[in-house]
Amino acid sequence: MVKIAFNTPTAVQKEEARQDVEALVSRTVRAQILTGKELRVVPQEKDGSSGRCMLTLLGLSFILAGLIVGGACIYKYFMPKSTIYHGEMCFFDSEDPVNSIPGGEPYFLPVTEEADIREDDNIAIIDVPVPSFSDSDPAAIIHDFEKGMTAYLDLLLGNCYLMPLNTSIVMTPKNLVELFGKLASGKYLPHTYVVREDLVAVEEIRDVSNLGIFIYQLCNNRKSFRLRRRDLLLGFNKRAIDKCWKIRHFPNEFIVETKICQE
């Protein structure tokens, strides 16, 4: 008879098997714990990143708002201030044929202006509209006391004409403000006389960038010419002049008729 015998595990084998099971369970538990921690940490990092983005955007919004408000304050308090004035004067033209009739009543011609006077910049910008009852041209005029220059822009021709500022004729911006104030209040009788100046365009000016920002803005990209008084030109040939026009304005308590001639 053959006997089949089963070997029963010894105590040592049982102990080794138990240790293997415990080690496997321990590794599994640690893996689950680590996985849970990682899962908990990742949302925290995402939440922290979103919070930082929100704080950054909020800070940028405050900075942008501060720049806008600050810029508005700077523009309001530090930009040059100007006031637009309107006025009208009437003058007696002794050369008008109507006024040469014996026994006739004097006929006064009106001159209207709009002036942008900037005392801080020491400048006066005059707008002479199309006249209603005279043969003069509409024009934009700049009297720049800082640069000592006067610029005429003939709005019909589109050309600029420049000359040294004549302070014996042109009032300072402060005095011009007072003059327009009198005209507006009716304290000044706007019936006055006319002073004539005869000017000739002698040469073209290619670059007006050194004549100040205001004259540059008026005359840039336009044909510009230097003016001289006719009586100061030696050997001047009157027959060489074939085009003349007039601009009437009042830079003072009287009317100035600026006659400009050009070949």
UniProtKB/Swiss-Prot annotation:
PROSITE patterns: BRICHOS. Disulfide bonds join 160-219. It is found in: Membrane. Glycans are attached at residue 166. GO terms for cellular component: membrane. It holds the Pfam family BRICHOS. Its main location: membrane. Residues 133-227 form the BRICHOS domain. Keywords: Disulfide bond, Glycoprotein, Membrane, Signal-anchor, Transmembrane, Transmembrane helix. The chain crosses the membrane at residues 54-74. Belongs to the ITM2 family. This is Integral membrane protein 2A. It comes from Mus musculus (Mouse). The gene is Itm2a.
